[in-house]
Amino acid sequence: MDLDKLLQHINIGEDHEIEFKSADGGLPNNIWETVSAFANTDGGYIILGVSESKSGLIISGVNKPNGLLKNFWNNHNNSRKLSTSICSNSDVQVLEVEAKNLVIITVPRAKRTQRPVYINNNPMTGTFKRNFEGDYCCSPEEVRQMLRDAANEPQDIQILEGFNSFAEFPILYVLSIAHK
């Protein structure tokens, strides 16, 4: 994320692809819900070091970015905290804005086979999705759907043996189904 886009979002506020979090006390405990939500939806940005005030969002900064990053990576790579290590080194950066450090975490959308991305070792209570500016806990049915989608190989990527041309397709397809 470039500086101009970041400053514009600070003026506009949060939405479906950006979440601001204060990091005054270190890594926020609720960051993992947001990582899960972005990974299970369309991806997004988590900006650490931006606080809410009565007048809107303000850049408060991150005091010790290296310690915060160490804590982030230790938890990110712990399967008891986060089911899938979704971010890579290039997804995390420290940016100086107004003489203060911000940590920008780009959370990519998880592949279908990686979902659900969940926290605390429990897919039924630890799977989140993003809806406008909030993270919400997925229902058991949503989680089961993600698990089904992850396990099933779509029919359109399977190679059907014995088909030499599309002209043969209808007859051979019907015959292959009849023999199953």
What are these regions (language model features)?
Residues 1-180:
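Conserved N-terminal catalytic/coupling substructures associated with nucleotide/phosphate chemistry
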